[in-house]
Amino acid sequence: MEFLPLWLCLGFHFLIVEWRSGRGTATAASQGGCKVVDRVADCRSLNLASVPSGLPAHSRMLVLDANPLRVLWNHSLQAYPRLEDLSLHSCHLDRISHWAFHEQGHLQNLVLADNRLSENYKESATALHTLLRLRRLDLSGNSLTEDMAALMLQNLSSLEVVSLARNTLMRLDDSVFEGLERLVELDLQRNYIFEIEGGAFDGLTELRRLNLAYNNLPCIVDFSLTQLRFLNVSYNILEWFLAAREEAAFELEILDLSHNQLLFFPLLPQCGKLHTLLLQDNSMGFYRELYNTSSPQEMVAQFLLVDGNVTNITTVSLWEEFSSSDLSALRFLDMSQNQLRHLPDGFLKKTPSLSHLNLNQNCLTKLHIREHEPPGALTELDLSRNQLAELHLAPGLTGSLKNLRVFNLSSNQLLGVPTGLFHSASSITTLDMSHNQISLCPQTVPLDWEEPSSCVDFRNMASLRSLSLDGCGLKALQDCPFQGTSLTHLDLSSNWGILNGSVSPLSAVAPTLQVLSLRNVGLGSGAAEMDFSGFGNLRELDLSGNSLTSFPKFKGSSALQTLDLRRNSLTALPQRVVSEQPLRGLQTIYLSQNPYDCCGVEGWGALQHFKTIADLSMVTCNLSSKIIRVVELPEGIPQDCKWGQVDTGLFYLVLILPSCLTLLVASTVIFLTFKKPLLQVIKSRCHWSSIY
């Protein structure tokens, strides 16, 4: 009994140690699940049902994304009073208790995207109203209506950035954003907005960026947000965009009206700073030249604007088109995928600062190049996929395209270009004339040649670096048509017979070429082995779709990185070819869709070792009339191929000799059977006496 107190003390001591140990383990586990670095606690995707309580109290940022929290209770965040950033993205939240943010006096950024806050929006709104320093709020993806959003944003005058994207907003008025005088950026994309009342944004005096993409707005009339710098109204159903007819200076710099149903060029502010205008994928056209101007009363459209008891009528001249718009600062204009049949006279003159013009996928049939049209500042012009059959260059005009660097004329109906057009573009580096039925001039055309040219001359274009002539129906090249250029990229694909089985017509640009595409040009059909030894800087070579029966030579071309030999007539992968230094330095090679013989792929193992075959699983070969994947071949030459290595004469001798001997014996027996006297004589002479 005297030892009982001692045992009790020891037991109590061990219980305390065990309890402290267990508590320490729990704390370590709660911190171990979250990544804590420099006052940032990242607890995303940990399947947490509540906010962890064991994180550092001085944490400034807490990320709880993708956890099934469901409810944010009053006490959930009490342990972290210094939070400045809180992210609760995709937490299944349907309720935020009244005092959940009561202790969060420092919170500036709050993300509540992709939750279910519409279910208890009044209580959640009460919780948000306690955040007096909040600057950024993300409420996207919560099924909020405009009334719910208005209640949640009420009294949050400190907000600078708000996202209400992917909700169910339909109609906006001045009550939704009331009191948000400091708001700079507003994201309303992917809602169901079909109407915006006049004055809905008038109280947002500091608003600079507005995103209304992916809604159902049918038109924007009397646009007067002069302070706005960025406006995105793409992917709506706009048929009209009309800025207010006032002399106030607009700050708008970027306007995106792409992917709508615009019928006319937008009427832009009369005084503005617009430098980027996106109008692709609409139904725009210029109609002045198509309309009978003798009926002025039919040349206007009137818009009736009803705002409460006030009715305004806006009258717009339909054929005025662009005349009153300020385009002087415009640098980037995209009008691709429209229905433009022509560009009005003077249109491009109003854009002296224009550097990028995209007109692809329209209905243009001709283009006149005059003084200041296109403007001298233009560096990139895309006229691809139109119906251009004529390019007109004003007589005596030189240097009109002196700053042009990228010129795309692909997929048109051009047969030639005006003499001197490319030489006036003295800075051009990239030219795409693919899919035009042009022909190359057999000799240099004089610059003072006045007759329309029916061919194209690329000689002596010193600045040209990239040229695409894919699918132009060109005949065999003669007399070095690229002489005087320093081409690094050349595409001659789909011009059958253009090289006439030899790469010698490219000798003038061979030292500078880095990327060469000779896809589907008829190489290898009855021609000698292709030799690219003179192409010392070649990095990429496309020889697919030809009839090559052997690997091309690359002696001295150590820069080669990519080689495409698909869809040829290669039957073997010799070891000697694979061991060449240029092929050993390859990074990517394509070899599929060739009729390889499995008995001739001894170089396959070395290629696999280099790990450069991009279409490895698609390469097949023929083994005993069976098509199998080369990766399934056993190491070394298959057993079935050994007979193929024996001398052919000896093979046939071994095959025929037994047949001949058998035939000789059979013939002798038959002959003797029908010659009975002779047979008896042989028997009598070959008869031996028996011992019996």
UniProtKB/Swiss-Prot annotation:
A GO cellular component annotation in the UniProt record: endoplasmic reticulum membrane
Glycan attachment positions: N74, N155, N232, N292, N309, N312, N408, N500, N622
Chain ranges of the LRRCT domain: 606-643
MF terms in GO: receptor ligand inhibitor activity; transforming growth factor beta binding
Keyword vocabulary terms for this entry: Cell membrane, Disulfide bond, Endoplasmic reticulum, Glycoprotein, Growth factor binding, Leucine-rich repeat, Membrane, Repeat, Signal, Transmembrane, Transmembrane helix
PANTHER family: AGAP008170-PA, INSULIN-LIKE GROWTH FACTOR-BINDING PROTEIN COMPLEX ACID LABILE SUBUNIT
Protein name, as recorded: Transforming growth factor beta activator LRRC33
Record organism: Rattus norvegicus (Rat)
